Each structure stands twice: as C-alpha cells, then as structure tokens.
C-alpha cells in the first residue's frame, strides 16, 4: 500500500512539474509578409515597399526567451512623361533586430526588438543616375500566438528613422514551433 501511494505521489509530482516546463528549450521559426510605409517631410510614396520577414525564437525557460528578426522590403518605380518612360527608381529596406520575449501563457508571447536598419534609394533618369543609402537604429514590438502546440502566428511593427526619412514596417507571419 505504501509503495502504491508513494508511486502515485511521485507520478503526480512529475506530471505537475512537466506542465510547468512546457516552453523551456523550445524554438520557433516563422516567415511572413512585410510592408513598409515611407514618409519624408510629410510626403509618402505612392506605393508602399513590400517584402518578407523571417523570425527565429528560442525559449530559455518557461517565461523568457530571445527572438531575432530579418526584414526586407522593395519597391520599384518607373518615371513617365505622358506615355514615354524616361527613368527608373528602386527603394530597398533591410533590418536585422533581436530582443527579449516573454511568454504570458501557453498561447501568447510578447517581444521587443532592437537592431539596425539600412535603406537604399537608386534612380536613373535619362543618362544620369544617383543613389543614396543610410544605416540607422531600428526598434519594434510584436506578439506571437500559439493556437496549436506546434503552430505560430506572428505580428509585429518596426520603426526606424533614416535621417529625415521615417520607415514603419508591419509584419505578419506564420511558422512552426519545435
């Protein structure tokens, strides 16, 4: 009788302890859509640059983890006078950020991001071409949902200021938790 009681108590304790470590040492990877809104001195681009976002997250323990993010957006422009094309331009935006993540419960995690952003503009009109680029700090925040144990839905916003150009990027993705 004592052995049965001891064994059942031990099994109950181990099962409770295993529920508390549901997130430790787990990883997730997600890929998704990114769209930047570019603004300078009150003016915005006619078409927002679009691209992709890739995130990797590692959970250190039940609550805390780290997350890394890479985002890329691009938009090409053609310049016309009437129906005649006389030039072309490209806007590219890259960012690499990382930061802490905090798991609120089994389904929801919040995170913050800090890192670097790089913007590049190239244009060629007739026989002339110009380009400019700038690297600056980027920061953001996001949320990850785990509606199923191995499925991740990710949503985040990132902001950077490249001299007088302000870039805000929304990202929405899905991925796998393992």
From Swiss-Prot:
GO terms for biological process: symbiont-mediated suppression of host complement activation. The keyword Transferase does not apply. It is a multi-pass membrane protein. InterPro entries: Bact_OM_Invasion-Related (IPR051723), Enterovir_OMP (IPR000758), OMP/PagP_b-brl (IPR011250), OMP_b-brl (IPR027385). It is found in: Cell outer membrane. The keyword Transmembrane applies. Keywords: Cell outer membrane, Membrane, Signal, Transmembrane, Transmembrane beta strand, Virulence. One of its GO terms (cellular component) is host outer membrane. It holds the Pfam family OMP_b-brl. Residues 1-23 form the signal peptide. It comes from the Bacteria. Belongs to the outer membrane OOP (TC 1.B.6) superfamily. Ail family. Promotes the invasion of pathogenic bacteria into eukaryotic cells by an unknown mechanism. This is Attachment invasion locus protein. It comes from Yersinia enterocolitica.
